[in-house]
Amino acid sequence: MKKSLFAAALLSLALAACGGEKAAEAPAAEASSTEAPAAEAPAAEAPAAEAAAAEAPAAEAPAAEAPAAEAAATEAPAAEAPAAEAAK
């Protein structure tokens, strides 16, 4: 259940980011007016789900890079210490 809530949140963020909220409402309105487009509604949702899945790794990438940047920051003073001793 947590995964579905997380996926729904990502989907809503993706739709809000690309302005697709208005586009997502149009197929829903068509589906309610006739019975045939109801079969098309899941197909229309698939690209949005793929977009959310594509954005998930991009959102995780900065978090993965942050520890590497922190590690470089902590290693820099240690690397400077031998250089300072060599200069003496």
Swiss-Prot record:
Keywords recorded for this protein, A-Z: Cell outer membrane, Lipoprotein, Membrane, Palmitate, Repeat, Signal
Entry keyword annotation includes Lipoprotein: yes
Location relative to the cell: Cell outer membrane
Sequence segments annotated as region (Disordered): 23-88
Cysteines joined through disulfide linkages: none
Lipidation (N-palmitoyl cysteine): C18
Sequence repeats: 23-27, 28-32, 33-37, 38-42, 43-47, 48-52, 53-57, 58-62, 63-67, 68-72, 73-77, 78-82, 83-87
Primary site of residence: membrane
The protein's name: Outer membrane protein H.8
